[in-house]
């Protein structure tokens, strides 16, 4: 009986949650340290980094705007805490859902974002998985938009670090939301779940916390000092304090190893994003190639933004593209589009984060 009582006194998070970490030089992508980094573990609310990445992508592609009014479903409203407290039938601007998901880590807001973009959470999860594959997150699979524990909803310290780097380089106009310690989320003023780390670690600028009983205490931490920029990801911390201390130690290690000067090598933005099929290049078409092209065309007609059915182009180069405006690089490009001008960046950041 005494042994049983002793077990009951041990925090559940301390009994579970395998540990993993990963540290990179953000400028080059160079790995500075790793431990258990490719083990598939529960990401918890680190998941919302992918939800937000897709939200930024959808805004850029013209699928939705920051001012779009989102009607909250019963499903989204039913999500457990952390939450914004949204009610079924309530309408709220997408910008407030983004703030709530990024800063407060609100599960109802994250679910509502997914439903607003893809119509349902399962459809959004499929898009999350397509995007993960395109980003090179080869050991991540997503089931929901918020990170609540679910069978098959897993990622790695390596993959979440890749995602953090892409958020920084692919969407610089929105990245500063991750450094905010509070924000107006429309129906409430929300405080950051990462505010302690942001306040305590010099140069910290994000990115996202995560916690569930199965995951333990997770964090993708980013900091910039001088010319250096390091991301350190921690999975399976024993507490908020333990997680933050580990992240600080890893960042210190990273800053110590990273050279003062390094040529920036931005990650290539994915050629295949969202509901858009991969571009197909066929030099000498065969029956097998033609069948593949037709299969891709058929897949497009089942997507939420389907092109007109029956329009299959069978040339030397068969390209199927989304009808929306794009700022993606051309096929073969190694660099993303240029960042907006400084004054435009500031205005866009104010739109979402202030």
Locate the predicted segments by residue.
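Bacterial N-terminal signal peptides
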Residues: 1-11
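Active-site-adjacent loops and short helices of periplasmic peptidoglycan-processing enzymes
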Residues: 11-157, 168
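Domain-terminus/edge residues, biased toward the C-terminal soluble/receptor-binding domains
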Residues: 137-141, 149-154, 158-354
